[in-house]
Amino acid sequence: MKRLTASLRLLTSALAMSLGQVPAWAQSAPASAAGPVLSLQLNAAQPSERDCRLTFVVNNALGADLSKAAFEIALFNDAGVVDRLTVLDFKALPAGKTKVTRFDLAGADCGKLSRVLINSATECTGVQPAACMRALKTSTKTAIAFGV
């Protein structure tokens, strides 16, 4: 009986140790293999003369060129109230490319901007119209909340 107990303990230990090493085929696929993604990052918000300049980094990993991509955004002030709605036109976004685009928002105060909300894709030419919103992944490098 002692031999059986010792053998079971040894077998249990070996099994527990082997579970820590997952074979490559069982590991998660990289994010790029998860499906098409249109990454949009709010990279900076800087005051300019009478304006707030928003800088975006966009990466088109949809697998197709976009001849035009534009999004309606809502800007929220520091009280959480919508200040305005506007459309940002990112123009052409080639497949597999990263692009930096800046927009000067006349009369906007960067210091009072608390949130940028993407309402909808007003243009998404090159893929199915809903693909730009469905595959959109947002992030921010600023203190301003950014997303859908």
Q: Residue locations for each model-derived region?
A:
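Bacterial N-terminal signal peptides
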Residues: 9-20
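Sec/Tat signal peptide C-region and signal peptidase I cleavage site
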Residues: 21-26
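Low-complexity, acidic Ser/Thr/Pro/Gly-rich terminal tails and inter-domain linkers that flank the onset
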Residues: 27-51, 55, 142-147
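Asparagine-centered strand-capping/turn motif at beta-strand->loop junctions
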Residues: 58-62
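Short acidic/proline- and small/hydrophobic-mixed sequence motifs that coincide with surface turns
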Residues: 65-68
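Short aromatic-acidic-glycine turn motif
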Residues: 75-86, 127
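Intrinsically disordered, low-complexity Pro/Gly/Ser/Thr-rich segments with frequent PxxP/GP/PP motifs
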Residues: 82-112
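Terminal connector regions
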Residues: 107-148
